[in-house]
């Protein structure tokens, strides 16, 4: 049965933006006034007739009415409310109600909790902020940019289509390296491959790329420069819509947008989507076909969410050797902890032990959703004996209902047992987890001095 669509907040926001009364809005939607009122308050789902009217009458992208954003807000609120500062956590139904009916309030709450957490961390570490007259309680520029990409599903339609038009006009791929060289020539820039530690450097009329960087990295950096040269107006317009609070966040986001363009040009949407389906998402074959790295391919797969031409919904993550998440994107219901690392039961942590191999895992999260997870180590050599080697592990996953579209599902028992994993120990209520680091803050604990199990306490429902 199709899931009912509740989008009251978005209906109300659209009506207010258009300056229409409920009566006029209802008439243009072909709905009665009481029914519109019920839909705006999420007492009734949005009917198919209303969805069609929104598209035809107001040009609304109906894919924006889905609840994926609300689900991410609920996940973030659950994690925030697991903080010890809160005695009790509201029921999940209440959180879903807030996320659906008052998303702006929910985001304000998350901003407030983030400000509190930053203040608490400053006090705990006695850092330099204690000496300031005013502590900056706003999110850090990096966090602000991270949340921007997080809440747009890591898919930016205008930038993605511009990159596809550049790399595959008319849907036919062209040699992006040659195209990029033509762009540089028209801009009066000369490309130089130099032996230098910096990956990319522009000095005057010379664009220098490091000879120590791998070929996919060089191509990516070249296309990054193309984005800055040819898409500046588009990037600036996108930044204007984002309304970042600081100049630093805007500058970081512009780099992120140029990187997005580079990845989308290296792996243009329609040709890459078709190749992914034909190869059954074989990352190594896709990397060879497009001259990209495995990490670039995995990252791109997580962005294939164009309305009307969506790919398999993946999540993508990259962790360092300490387990810290350094990249995270999700087009699935799977969400990552905003603070700390990933669940230690996840196979991404074991990828460092098996270099050069893909690890497969069938896993189930506490909400009952089952996933096929892939993990592999990736190394980024420094290009010389004395240069440090950066080592990471990447994880890619999709819900098991899409597993047949992946070559990595072959030979796995998709109806068999699934390993339990979570998001963060603080919001995971699994009782028999041998890797738990802290107790779940939404549960009561029982401590028996005469008995010791896996944990020094018992989790009580």
Swiss-Prot record:
Q: Which UniProt keywords apply?
A: DNA-binding, Transcription, Transcription regulation
This protein's source sits in the domain of life called: Bacteria
The UniProt annotation gives the DNA-binding region as: 22-41
Signal peptide bounds: none
Listed Gene3D superfamilies: lambda repressor-like DNA-binding domains (1.10.260.40)
CDD domains, per database record: HTH_XRE
Pfam families with a match to the protein in the record? HTH_3 (PF01381), Peptidase_M78 (PF06114), ScfRs (PF09856)
Return the SUPFAM superfamilies for the record: lambda repressor-like DNA-binding domains
Q: Which GO terms describe its cellular component?
A: cytosol
Cross-referenced InterPro entries, in alphabetical order?
Answer: Bact_TransReg_Diox, Cro/C1-type_HTH, HTH_RamB, IrrE_HExxH, Lambda_DNA-bd_dom_sf, ScfR_C
Gene deletion effect = Mutant is unable to grow with propionate-HCO(3)(-) as the carbon source. However, the mutant can grow normally with succinate or acetate as the carbon source.
- Does Protein transport appear among the keywords? no
* Domain HTH cro/C1-type residues, every copy: 11-65
Task: Recall the GO molecular function terms of this protein's record.
Answer: DNA binding; DNA-binding transcription factor activity
What the protein does comes down to: Transcriptional regulator that controls propionyl-CoA assimilation through the methylmalonyl-CoA pathway via regulation of pccB expression.
Hey, which family's this protein in? Belongs to the short-chain fatty acyl-CoA assimilation regulator (ScfR) family.
Q: What is this protein called?
A: Propionyl-CoA carboxylase regulator
Whose protein is this, by species? Cereibacter sphaeroides (strain ATCC 17023 / DSM 158 / JCM 6121 / CCUG 31486 / LMG 2827 / NBRC 12203 / NCIMB 8253 / ATH 2.4.1.) (Rhodobacter sphaeroides)
Lineage, please? Bacteria, Pseudomonadati, Pseudomonadota, Alphaproteobacteria, Rhodobacterales
């Amino acid at each position: 049965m199709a899931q009912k669509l509740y989008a009251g907040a978005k209906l109300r926001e659209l009506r207010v933006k258009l300056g229409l009364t409920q009566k006029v809005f209802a008439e243009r939607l072909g709905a009665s006034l009481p029914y519109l009122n019920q839909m705006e308050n999420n007492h009734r789902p949005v009917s198919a007739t209303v969805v069609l009217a929104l598209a035809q009458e107001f040009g609304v992208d109906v894919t924006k009415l889905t609840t994926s954003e609300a689900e991410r807000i609920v996940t973030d609120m659950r994690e925030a409310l697991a903080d010890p500062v809160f005695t009790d956590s509201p029921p999940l139904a209440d959180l879903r109600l807030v996320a659906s009916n008052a998303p702006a309030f929910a985001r304000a709450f998350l901003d407030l909790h983030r400000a509190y957490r930053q203040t608490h961390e400053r006090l705990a570490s006695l850092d330099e902020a204690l000496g300031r007259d005013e502590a900056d309680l706003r999110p850090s520029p990096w966090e602000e940019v991270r949340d921007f990409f997080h809440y747009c599903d890591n898919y930016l339609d205008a930038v993605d289509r511009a990159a596809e038009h550049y790399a595959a006009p008319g849907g036919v791929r062209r040699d992006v390296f040659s195209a990029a060289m033509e762009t540089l020539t028209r801009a009066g820039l000369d490309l130089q491959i130099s032996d230098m530690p910096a990956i990319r450097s522009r000095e005057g009329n010379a664009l220098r790329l490091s000879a120590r960087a791998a070929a996919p990295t060089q191509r990516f950096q070249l296309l990054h420069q193309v984005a800055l040269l040819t898409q500046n107006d588009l990037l600036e317009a996108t930044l204007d819509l984002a309304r970042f609070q600081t100049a630093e966040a805007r500058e970081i986001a512009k780099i992120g947008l140029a990187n997005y363009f580079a990845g989308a040009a290296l792996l243009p949407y329609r040709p890459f989507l078709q190749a992914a389906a034909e190869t059954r998402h074989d990352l190594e074959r896709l990397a060879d076909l497009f001259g990209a790295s495995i990490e670039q391919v995995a990252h791109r797969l997580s962005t294939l969410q164009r309305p009307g031409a969506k790919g398999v919904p993946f999540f993508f993550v990259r962790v360092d050797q300490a387990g810290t998440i350094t990249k995270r994107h999700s087009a699935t219901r799977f969400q990552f902890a905003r603070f700390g690392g990933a669940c230690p039961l996840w196979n991404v942590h074991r990828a460092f032990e098996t270099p050069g191999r893909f690890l497969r895992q069938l896993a189930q999260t506490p909400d009952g959703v089952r996933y096929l997870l892939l993990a592999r180590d990736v190394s980024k050599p420094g290009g010389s004996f004395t240069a440090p080697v950066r080592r990471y592990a990447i994880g890619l996953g999709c819900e098991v209902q899409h597993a047949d579209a992946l070559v990595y599902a072959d030979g796995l028992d998709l109806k068999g047992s699934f390993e339990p994993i979570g998001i963060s120990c603080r919001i995971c209520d699994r009782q028999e987890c041998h890797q738990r680091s802290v107790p779940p803050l939404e549960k009561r604990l029982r401590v028996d001095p005469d008995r010791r199990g896996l944990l020094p306490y018992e989790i009580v429902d």
